[in-house]
UniProtKB/Swiss-Prot annotation:
EC number of the protein: 1.3.7.7
Cofactor(s) of this protein: [4Fe-4S] cluster
Subunit structure: Homodimer. Protochlorophyllide reductase is composed of three subunits; ChlL, ChlN and ChlB.
Chain's role: Component of the dark-operative protochlorophyllide reductase (DPOR) that uses Mg-ATP and reduced ferredoxin to reduce ring D of protochlorophyllide (Pchlide) to form chlorophyllide a (Chlide). This reaction is light-independent. The L component serves as a unique electron donor to the NB-component of the complex, and binds Mg-ATP.
InterPro entries: NifH/chlL_CS, NifH/frxC, P-loop_NTPase, Protochlorophyllide_ATP-bd
Gene3D superfamilies xref list: P-loop containing nucleotide triphosphate hydrolases
Species in which this protein is naturally found: Gloeobacter violaceus (strain ATCC 29082 / PCC 7421)
Taxon lineage: Bacteria, Bacillati, Cyanobacteriota, Cyanophyceae, Gloeobacterales
Matches recorded under PROSITE patterns: NIFH_FRXC_1 (PS00746), NIFH_FRXC_2 (PS00692), NIFH_FRXC_3 (PS51026)
Family: Belongs to the NifH/BchL/ChlL family.
Protein name: Light-independent protochlorophyllide reductase iron-sulfur ATP-binding protein
Pathways involved: Porphyrin-containing compound metabolism; chlorophyll biosynthesis (light-independent)
Keyword flag Repeat: no
Gene name linked to the record: chlL
Length: 275
């Protein structure tokens, strides 16, 4: 199974992805998480450090792909989850999307996809240009991380449009939304009423999740010494169980930008402002 996780920048994709990866590993699956972001910090909470990127390794090898081995680019993180970071070009130069495409090419040559039960792509923000949309060409399911706010749902809608486009030539389905750091879901419900898709889970604002990111640990690792965090782990196990059940998913039909803007902004305009 191949999963592509997208969402607005800063929404908590990487933290969520790492915890989903561990949850899948705890369900007995061999998991490979691939960070597709020039910041190369997707797998930080799994490994506890910024692992060398594929671009770093290729530079060391003078871009001789035949000299790159799996152990050069794949690192083992918490729970036995294997980790890869694509990396990116220097700031202001080159194309990060191209790097993602080359990463897919190298990992296929290394047969990394064949050695794992689940491949999880954690992809840069809501940028869905051709290069950063490349993981959708490989994915069985897309998962969108959002919150209960206008900007995140607007980004989710653009990602849904990319899923619909890719599904024309590839058997891709949108597994659904994960609400992150949100104590309300009224705007999420309004969106999925307009653009039908499953809501896999809603995670409230939990300070320990934010702290886990700073500490470079998954919530599962923190729960080993703090059993009170086990209910938090259950959110991610619920998502993992849903995905492992091979859900039917949907091919979404996104809302036109102007219609979505009116839909969501109308909600805010009708919400009473406290005195």
């Amino acid at each position: 199974m191949k999963l592509a996780v997208y969402g607005k920048g800063g929404i908590g994709k990487s933290t969520t992805s790492c915890n989903i990866s561990v949850a899948l590993a705890k369900r007995g699956r061999r998991v490979l998480q691939i960070g597709c972001d020039p910041k190369h910090d997707s797998t930080f909470t799994l490994t506890g450090f910024l692992i060398p990127t594929i671009i770093d390794t290729l530079e060391e090898k003078d871009y001789h792909y035949e000299d790159v081995y799996a152990e050069d680019v794949i690192y083992e993180g918490y729970g036995g989850v294997h980790c890869v970071e694509a990396g990116g070009p220097p700031a202001g130069a080159g194309c990060g999307g191209y790097v993602v495409g080359e990463t897919m090419k190298l990992l296929k040559e290394l047969r990394a996809f064949e050695d794992h039960d689940v491949i999880l792509f954690d992809v840069l923000g809501d940028v869905v240009c051709g290069g950063f949309a490349a993981p959708l060409n490989y994915a069985d399911y897309c998962v969108i991380i959002t919150d209960n706010g206008f900007d995140a749902l607007f980004a989710a809608n653009r990602i849904a449009a990319s899923c619909r486009e890719k599904a024309r030539t590839h058997p891709l389905k949108l597994a659904g939304l994960v609400g992150n750091r949100t104590n309300k879901r009224d705007l999420i419900d309004k969106y999925v009423e307009a653009v039908p898709m499953p809501v896999l889970e809603i995670l409230p604002l939990i300070e320990d999740i934010r702290v886990s990111r700073v500490k470079g640990k998954t919530i599962f690792e923190m729960a080993e010494t703090d059993p009170s965090l086990e209910p938090v782990c259950q959110y991610y196990l619920n998502i993992a169980d849903h995905l492992l059940a091979c859900p039917e998913g949907v091919v979404p039909q996104e809302c036109p930008d102007r219609a979505l803007f009116e839909l969501l902004s109308d909600f805010y305009s009708r919400t009473p402002v406290p005195a």
